Amino acid sequence: MLYQLLHTVLSVTGVTLNAFMMYLALTKSPKIMRPCSAIITIKTFTDILTSAMSFFVMQRIVTDGSSILVIPTGPCTRLGPTACYVGHMFMLCFLECNLIWMISSYIFRYYILYVRDPSIKSLVFVALCLSIPSFIHMAAWIRSYDPNEAFVVPDSFGLASSHLILGGHIVYRSTITLILQLFITSVLVLIAYAWIRNTLLSFAIKMGSDKNDVKNLNARLVKVINFQVFLPTFIFLGFFIFAAMFGRYITVNIAQYLVSIAFMFSPICSPFSYILFVPHYLNVITGNKKPAENRATDMCAVRAFKNPNVSVTMTNA
């Protein structure tokens, strides 16, 4: 019961924070920030779906290396094992899509910096294209799942017979595959972070490090990505807990609760990277109206510094 309560609090918090961030991005972003608001909207949308699936399943993951069991305790249990397995797969898939979109957002920032602002339609199209492989992969696993497949529950897990338990060959292979994919994608996020951070610093040098506006802009951009790179650490934490259980380095008594909880903190913390470090959104929340010239260093105004004839004066949305 305590685990379900904790999962509910985390899921509701994740949905609420990301819905609020989506509201800010859609309704409070000035015109000059539209490309970035689209990027933020897509990111928060996947975070909302991740949190919703977490609530739907409220899963524990147990393994000793020879078997992997998923114990759902959420609303999906009323619909049966297939619904819970679908929810389990959707949650892991949305987490992966979230990480992939983080990498894509870094690439888009480079594109905005050195080429031009992409259209919102192109951003949505790219997001859909990036999601398709993950969903096809997930659909293949779901199609192969057999809720009637027999499997053995090790006595060492201490699971009651009254629990709804998902197990078997497909659960084993799909879970270990997707968790490994999450780990690999998180590593790619770190690589992309190092690249975009160096790009921002190089841009500041090219534009002249003696310009205060460029200094402030890049400092804020670096703060955003520094915060965002912290998000995959929760995926790493969940992965290493799972790996420790898998290798029998830790007992399952407490570890079985920690994998999903660790994963949940990534969508919960994500909105703060924008709320805390994008001045426009922070000013909207605090009701602080700063002069237009101080607001010109928002995230998507960066390209204007390449051309001194371009005005970056922004107005409230």
Curated annotation (Swiss-Prot):
It holds the Pfam family 7TM_GPCR_Srd. InterPro entries: 7TM_GPCR_serpentine_rcpt_Srd, Nematode_rcpt-like_delta. GO terms for cellular component: membrane. Keywords: Membrane, Transmembrane, Transmembrane helix. The chain crosses the membrane at residues 5-25, 38-58, 83-103, 122-142, 176-196, 227-247, 258-278. It is found in: Membrane. It is a multi-pass membrane protein. Belongs to the nematode receptor-like protein srd family. This is Serpentine receptor class delta-26. It comes from Caenorhabditis elegans.
